[in-house]
From Swiss-Prot:
Top-rank taxon, per record: Eukaryota
Name of this chain's protein: Ciliary microtubule-associated protein 2
InterPro entries, alphabetized: CIMAP2
Organism: Homo sapiens
Expression across tissues: Sperm.
Coiled coil: none
Disulphide bond pairs: none
Length: 418
């Protein structure tokens, strides 16, 4: 039964008319198609030249698969023999035609020469017009917009803030409560005889608890008489005499202050005032000071000389150098064997701390850490055999510091020493 189904499935697969040949029997999962064939599902998204889909592509399997190096002719290209012969044959004709055209005069030769002669004749004072910088600026293309014009609409619309302004917020922090209530009232409006406000209905009248004859009501006449009424009549516009100037209002006059005697300061009070306190007092400062009191003269050394006690650049006297006999180093050397520069060059030490020193530009990886005979450079060089005791000491210092510390190297493969 299974074999009959497989045969029927294979026969059905061939009946579909697919370009690819099915090399298996049976239909996995009830589908008569290849496992990796997605051309029917995504025909436009099918990626060519892939491992699983390229063999099932009709174009890449039959039309393009035979193309390769040596499988096509060069007749279709621009380097074919026919194309090259055609170009070579027409070269001399094109060159001859170009030579003939260069020998022909221009069709506006006379007009051009006439214009050149007129320009040469017009040269002279007053015969030409030179444009100044203002005319050149006017001729330049410019914009009608100013420096601050951005070309954008200032108020295009709402910028995202749809909330009411200050003072328009509703109940419980919801600004739309009042708007919703108004919309509800408009959509559910009551009749003309109904109330239009949201006030509650008045409560029914209840008794006050007072007995009969224990209270009385004022009549309308008593209420009218008890009202507070002004004493001015309907024609009394201003209180007081109308002949006097108006004390207030639009046509009022300025009130003048009463004239009084002014208190002037006496001579003694003005002399003892705060402003005249220093008048007539002898100054404690010298009349001709060594340095001017104005700060503007302090930058000039001739007008403001510096004191000898002042410290700073160029404020001390240089010491006189004494000529000392110098013992020349041997071996025709011109530099000392000791010093800061020699210590840096030989010992590899670089101390960045100090006046005139610079930062350490050496990398720690490239720094030479080998042990050197530092004792040779602690003092100046002297001639040999000038001091025998010192020469013996120097001979001991030349001895390496590892002498006698390293174990002897023994070759156990060789014969022992007799």
């Amino acid at each position: 039964m299974r074999e009959s189904q497989d045969a029927a499935g294979a026969h059905g697969w061939n009946r579909v008319g697919s370009t690819a040949t099915k090399w298996f029997t049976g239909a996995p999962f009830g589908v008569q198609s290849h496992r990796f064939d997605i051309s029917a599902v995504y025909p436009n998204w099918k990626k060519f030249s892939t491992f699983t889909e390229a063999p099932y592509s009709t174009r890449y399997s039959t039309q393009v698969s035979h193309i390769g190096p040596g499988t096509y002719s060069s007749k279709e290209t621009c380097f074919s023999k026919k194309k090259l012969m055609k170009e070579v044959d027409t070269g001399w004709a094109k060159a001859q035609e170009a030579t003939r055209l260069t020998q022909l005069p221009h069709f506006q030769y006379q007009a051009i020469m006439k214009e050149k002669r007129l320009k040469e004749q017009k040269l002279g004072p007053g015969s030409y017009n030179l444009k100044d910088f203002l005319e050149q600026l006017r001729e330049k293309p410019c914009s009608t917009r100013g420096l601050l014009s951005s070309g954008e609409v200032r108020f295009r619309g709402l910028t995202g803030n749809y909330y009411p302004g200050p003072g328009n917020y509703g109940e419980k922090g919801n600004p739309y409560t009042k708007l919703e209530e108004n919309a509800w009232n408009r959509s559910h409006s009551e009749g003309l005889m109904c109330r239009m406000s949201n006030k509650p209905h008045p409560r029914p009248h209840q008794g006050s608890g007072l007995g009969p004859g224990t209270y009385f009501f004022k009549s309308d006449l008593e209420t009218y008489v008890a009202r507070s009424v002004g004493t001015r009549g309907p024609y009394d516009t201003f209180s007081g005499d109308r002949s006097k100037p108006l004390p207030y209002g639009h046509y009022s006059m300025q009130k003048k202050k009463p004239r009084e005697l002014m208190n002037f300061k006496s001579f003694v009070e003005e002399l003892n005032s705060h402003h005249n306190k220093k008048h007539g007092v002898f100054s404690k400062l010298p009349r001709n000071p060594k340095t001017p009191t104005e700060r503007i003269y302090w930058a000039n050394l001739s007008q403001c000389p510096r004191t000898l006690a002042t410290s700073g650049p160029s404020f001390w006297l240089p010491q006189e150098k004494k000529c000392k006999p110098v013992n020349q180093p041997p071996f025709l050397l011109t530099s000392k064997g000791s010093g800061a520069k020699a210590c840096q060059m030989i010992m590899g030490s670089w101390n960045p701390v100090g006046v005139g020193r610079y930062l350490n530009t050496w990398l720690m990886e490239t720094k030479d850490r080998r042990q050197r005979y530092r004792s040779l450079f602690l003092s100046g060089s002297k001639r040999y055999l000038s001091d025998l005791a010192r020469d013996m000491l120097m001979q001991e210092r030349i001895t390496p510091f590892t002498k006698g510390k390293c174990p002897p190297t023994v070759d156990y493969n060789s014969d022992p020493t007799p």
